[in-house]
Curated annotation (Swiss-Prot):
Its main location: membrane. This is CASP-like protein SELMODRAFT_431320. Belongs to the Casparian strip membrane proteins (CASP) family. The chain crosses the membrane at residues 32-52, 76-96, 117-137. The lineage of its organism: Eukaryota, Viridiplantae, Streptophyta, Embryophyta, Tracheophyta. InterPro entries: CASP_dom. It comes from Selaginella moellendorffii (Spikemoss). Residues 1-31, 97-116 are cytoplasmic.
Length: 137
């Protein structure tokens, strides 16, 4: 009975957990990721455009009342988070395009950078969920 190598143990167990993690992290630098970043940037831009331009005018007892988005702290929080997410999405898309246009392959990035992207995505997801709940508090 000899000593089994790590690759043979990984092959017997199916797939090594490290390989699965690497495949997941490589998804953050795929062309689909670029399209999702652009879609996120478009949606954040639309959110900011609707917030800035929306006004509601109502006349109550011959008094003209104008409601604007800056009167609500939840909507201000939504505008700030949308602006930050817009900047992050554009930055990530620009980094991907620079890596794609240069000699570097965007799929051959460092694992630490992929973990940073994953962490930042999780933080922005948490902020987005928090924004959606801010209006109900």
């Amino acid at each position: 009975m000899g000593v089994a190598s790590q690759s043979s143990v990984a092959n017997e167990a199916g797939a090594a957990p490290e390989a699965s993690i690497q495949q997941t992290l490589r998804g953050f630098s795929s062309p689909t990721s670029l399209l999702l970043r652009i879609a996120t940037a478009v949606l954040c831009t639309l959110t900011l455009a609707f917030l800035v331009t929306s006004k509601e005018r109502k006349e109550i007892a011959s008094i003209d009342i104008v409601a604007i988005w800056s009167n609500s702290k939840a909507l201000i929080f939504l505008a700030v988070v949308s602006g930050i997410c817009l900047g992050y999405s554009l930055l990530h898309a620009a980094v991907f395009l620079v890596m794609l246009s240069g000699n570097r392959n965007p799929l051959a990035r460092k694992k630490a950078l992929d973990w940073m992207v994953f962490l930042a995505d999780q933080i922005f997801c948490w902020f987005s969920i928090r924004v959606s709940n801010a209006g109900f508090v």
